[in-house]
Swiss-Prot record:
The gene is Klhl3. PROSITE patterns: BTB. GO terms for cellular component: Cul3-RING ubiquitin ligase complex; cytoplasm; cytoskeleton; cytosol. This is Kelch-like protein 3. Pathway: Protein modification; protein ubiquitination. Residues 1-24 are annotated as: Disordered.
Amino acid sequence: MEGESVKPSPQPTEQAGDGEKNRRMITVNPAHMGKAFKVMNELRSKRLLCDVMIVAEDVEVEAHRVVLAACSPYFCAMFTGDMSESKAKKIEIKDVDGQTLSKLIDYIYTAEIEVTEENVQVLLPAASLLQLMDVRQNCCDFLQSQLHPTNCLGIRAFADVHTCTDLLQQANAYAEQHFPEVMLGEEFLSLSLDQVCSLISSDKLTVSSEEKVFEAVISWINYEKETRLDHMAKLMEHVRLPLLPRDYLVQTVEEEALIKNNNTCKDFLIEAMKYHLLPLDQRLLIKNPRTKPRTPVSLPKVMIVVGGQAPKAIRSVECYDFEEGRWDQIAELPSRRCRAGVVFMAGHVYAVGGFNGSLRVRTVDVYDGVKDQWTSIASMQERRSTLGAAVLNDLLYAVGGFDGSTGLASVEAYSYKTNEWFFVAPMNTRRSSVGVGVVEGKLYAVGGYDGASRQCLSTVEQYNPATNEWIYVADMSTRRSGAGVGVLSGQLYATGGHDGPLVRKSVEVYDPGTNTWKQVADMNMCRRNAGVCAVNGLLYVVGGDDGSCNLASVEYYNPVTDKWTLLPTNMSTGRSYAGQWVSASGA
């Protein structure tokens, strides 16, 4: 064709015995089909050689039977079968609007089509009718890319009606993964009873607390209270009340009028109260749908390790992909930071306070995993390094720490909704190098260093946000400053730390139900100033130092076997005083 040269391979010299094989050559012109369709479309636009007119509503489109039949099994069956349309010059297509039909026939000739929010809901069923499966798939891909907490349930319903199996599964998974946002929308409130039950009964529902599920049920009932009131018991059957903190059961669930006025719901509440009275080992023996923790698949989880000392304060941030089993570098901190508190809240990672190599800071940086970038938000009221940080009831708590001259007993909280910090009740003891964790709606401050007495601490304090008070609970068996603290299965773990020059590898665990500590297996290595997080029923301890050098290794604890195992892959940088957290990738 004009403008194109197809270069044949050199003609091989015929050898004895080669015969016919060496007198033939096959060439392929990859542009031939595209050019042919371009010419056919030009002929169509000029109404040349057209032999059929396709009509929908008031739109008439002239075309070539052979082209339509070649690209659409629907038209192929129509034109090659015994139906009257096989010979008709004018064919009407019902259940498709004229503009959509025109776009799809354009696609047959050009292989181009624009999918938009405005046309996708008519384009997909029309493509399905004409059996243009690549267009149908493009529509599904577009809808999948548009999934949002405000529309995922509508897209799920649309996919169900049109038998788009993959899209249906993707939309359902999205709704489960983003349930705290989905439950606030009009689509959730408009679901049928069976649809709500199906959603909230899923083990894969991703919620930070069962409180969200309870709140969703109350919201759905109240949206059309008169017609939905009788459904309360059926819905509460799927709310895992035993997994809620005792304070929440007493102060919120028991006081809810919809619960008070329903005997079956009161029975569910009593079941939860009795569950909380049992020792932990007996709770584990109770097996029913309401005592089973949810196991959300969510998005692939990553462990993010932020800054640290290596040996000076660094900006480096690494993330570990649990599915791939590898470490990757992600966006660096805006400035060097070690000895910070790090938490995951509202879909973002927060790095709070710390030490920049010369000064203790009160600044806070937030990481957006979608954009892979850090931004700064409101600073704390006080400078803090070696602080503890945790999230409780949608507030970020900064606990204790060191301001450059003295250890701190003060505690402040941050609301991401108002971007403001405010003080809450101080601890009873100044604590720097303190570990913190949240269990059953209470905040715990574990060990640390009291600058006044110059001693490492074995004491532990508990904060109740409802009363704004700190009280002492049972001491650890040993003094620990710089202990890594994490929460697993409703228990508080204190790992490693040091008492003076002695760096520990011992680990003890606190049961709030009995107010007691017990020893579990030692770690493989002595560690202080390490990060700790829980993932899929395992407790991970990241980095730290052993008293002589910073560590790049990571080990995890399995409570079922009471064993620690070293992760096969180390971080790229040995670091202590790093903060780390686990989030969903892309969060």
